[in-house]
Amino acid sequence: MSESALPRKNNAYNRFLLLVAGLGGLLYGVDVGIIAGALPYLEATSGLNAGQLSIVVAAVLLGSVISTLFAGMLADWMGRRLVMTLSGILFVTSIPTIALAHGYEPLVLGRVLQGISAGLIGVVVPLYLAECLTPDSRGKGTAIFQWLLTLGIVAAALVGIYFSFRVDEVTKLGDPAKVLAFKDTAWRSIFWVSLPPGVLFVIGTVMVAESPRWLFRRGRTEAARAALLRSRAVAQADAELGEMAAETAKRSTGERVKESLLRRKYVIPFVLACIILACTQAVGINSIIAYNTTILLQSGLSDVQAHWGYVFFTIVNFLMTFAGVMLVDRKGRKFLLSIGTTGLFISLLAVGILFSRAESRRVDSSRAMQAMVGAGQKLSLVYDHKTADTLLTAAGKAGQAAADQATSLIVIYSYGDFRAATPVARSDDAMAKPVEINRESCVPANKVVAFFSNPFGNLEAARQAPLKIENALITPVPGAGNGWLVAISLLVYA
């Protein structure tokens, strides 16, 4: 029965189901995309080193991997609707955990919660749609989930650029303390803004019915029929109940598929599909999204320009997802896969060449910086044009960068067996905090963290070891033209 032939109340409920599923996709997209806009401000104000920041970024993927492994099991045990509600609650909980965080551990915890939420949503919402929607609406439900997932990434980028404009306005006032305070407010606010969709998703999941197939498998036939009647006419609901009963009868009589799934014609396509899926992740799509703004900043764009580049990237990603769904049946999977793979190769090659060209003028001034280390085995450095010129001169590279050209500095240092890196500092950022190098930001506070940092490291020795500057890399910041070339290359990637 077509959707138009259903009673009005059934059509309204089906639209509500699609809305709730769409909110699930939107949350998934926000989970993936929100960190890119917040990361530059988090890096500038949190005092975390580069390794800690990378873990904050990657924690959402860790949570997603963990929850994806158990999502199906939880959905069978607790029910589809309850797991969706749980995923929404986890997302809502993660926002204040992150936005109110004053330290490394709460940030990681909040990001892990976001990842767990995303993993549950990514598995359970499509499963729920497949079991609840009428056959002629299932394709629409899957498409809406995927479109709103990419739209969630766009929304996260738009939130980021709004706060980028605000930061730019405060920067023009010329007060470093106010700029630092507002950057701290900015990254927290970016996460707060993503809270309302999570609340709406939780409310929506409470209002929908449980999956009729899950209810039927639990022996709750009348509840399953009631759930079906919310989205179907009586005749169609009874017909689907009959199909469920027939499937159950087949299983109870011990009827099995006679052909082995381990035959060559099944195994090879399965292995190839797994390899292709693994390769789509190995090309770094999640990292490109999470670090998009940071990549564009390092390629030569200003803060506002970098956020615009991220907005363009997410919009192209959204449009290409729409185009892919429209063309997949017309042009075929192989054609789209070939086009996409070619685009990825060209994009990554172009970005690599552009960064390689910029970094060919990189200078290591580690010896000069090591000489600055005092008796306390720590170092605080205001990195500006004068400091850059001093370090370059000491490294025998005087004049490597023009007097008015911005340079970036990243310091890799160690205490004993433990290493860390400073966030990237720029000589043209008069509002930036000093580069701080100390034992607390490198040596783990306890043995548990030390094990994950370096399983073979000697923690007690590191607490007494002197500071060693391993690399102090000064790189001329490319111009905006180079930055826009990188942005265009990333659009091809999208």
Predicted segments, located by residue:
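Transmembrane-helix signature of 12-pass secondary carriers
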Residues: M1-A494
